[in-house]
Amino acid sequence: MSKLVLVLNCGSSSLKFAVVDAETGAEHLTGLAECLGLPEARMKWKLDGKHEAQLGAGAAHVEALSFMVETILASKPELKANLGAIGHRIVHGGEQFTQSALITDDVLKGIQDAATFAPLHNPAHLIGIEAAKVNFPGLQNVAVFDTAFHQTMPEESYLYALPYNLYKEHGIRRYGMHGTSHLFITREVANLLDKPVEEVNIINCHLGNGASVCAIKNGKSVDTSMGLTPLEGLVMGTRCGDIDPAIVFHLHDALGYSVEQINNMLTKESGLAGLTEVTSDCRFVEDNYGEKEEATRAMDVFCHRLAKYVAGYTASMEGRLDAITFTGGIGENSGPIREMVLNRLGIFGIEVDGEANLKARFGGEGTITTANSRIPAMVISTNEELVIAEDAARLAGL
């Protein structure tokens, strides 16, 4: 039986898709529909070369998925015919889902219930699931939750110091994100170190436009920087990360900002975009560090925050840390950021290998610290699509 899986990731205004062989990891098709719901809605994909097409003004997730089926897959009927399952990335599963699940009515309800914590993403996931059912009526759908990996966190890590009934009655707690990526990196480190996953102790830095750190002890998440939502934690592309909560009251009461304006500011106008007042693109920050004040300011704050988190998470390791790992678009490609962060952790006996660090980009992987470094640091390319495909194949019985 074929182990080809269609992997879908429906964002608020995007649809990322791939056809992945769950057995070999080979990607037979990859693509991205973006600007959904807007006049410039378009799709880019790779299948026997690179392609691009306009989807039509206002095209949304349903139209994008239909285009993928009726135009792209129609050009490769054998690819569509060999699909065995569909795996959906789900941003938030609340406390209900500790692992991936075959999608049933109960699972759909759980995704809907968790939408209160991910109001932009979970509703889009539900649209994608329904569209997939229509276009692929014979295939089983599997939900793979970003939050599931973090359900092993102890109470001391996931509770906020708020009235306890807010957790008991309303589920207000730390959930974390990027769990699929953190899980993949944990497995990769186990392979690299030739030890069981259950013995791996790492601090993984998933750095992209969204970013999070995860403390992983004995192969399980014990703490992570994102919280109830993806807004908490590190400085990100447009998200503020950690701030004094009273800033919200000051913005509202003293400066006259509406709740909607504050929400928009913290999620879409802060982070690197806010600090530079120019762009959320980390490449601008890196390229202009030391030359432009706004770039220098943003990079210093970004690296300081990240180094603080990494240092703090050593408290969860109980005396043994196998590695500090970097992944995600920034983590895999920004040598200067990795070096700045690791240099701030010199108290742990970490020594960066400058040459190895420079080589580890654009798909290059490996250890970026010297042989004398007490704790190794590694760059590892993440592959969330493969984890989703593997779980979908397993649960669908492929």
Swiss-Prot record:
Keyword set includes Metal-binding: yes
Record-marked site positions (Transition state stabilizer): H178, R239
PROSITE patterns (alphabetical): ACETATE_KINASE_1, ACETATE_KINASE_2
Pathway where this protein functions: Metabolic intermediate biosynthesis; acetyl-CoA biosynthesis; acetyl-CoA from acetate: step 1/2
Catalytic residues, chain numbering: D146 (proton donor/acceptor)
Chief location of this protein within or outside the cell: cytoplasm
Residues the record lists as binding ATP: K16, H206, L207, G208, N209, G210, D281, C282, R283, G329, I330, G331, E332, N333
Pfam families: Acetate_kinase
InterPro entries in UniProt: Ac/propionate_kinase, Aliphatic_acid_kin_short-chain, Aliphatic_acid_kinase_CS, ATPase_NBD
Enzyme Commission number(s) of this protein: 2.7.2.1
Cofactor: how bound: Mg(2+). Can also accept Mn(2+).
GO molecular function ontology, one term from the record: acetate kinase activity
UniProt keyword annotations, A-Z: ATP-binding, Cytoplasm, Kinase, Magnesium, Metal-binding, Nucleotide-binding, Transferase
Subunit structure: Homodimer.
Chain's role: Catalyzes the formation of acetyl phosphate from acetate and ATP. Can also catalyze the reverse reaction.
HAMAP family: Acetate_kinase
Name of the protein this chain belongs to: Acetate kinase
Species whose genome carries this gene: Vibrio campbellii (strain ATCC BAA-1116)
Originating gene: ackA
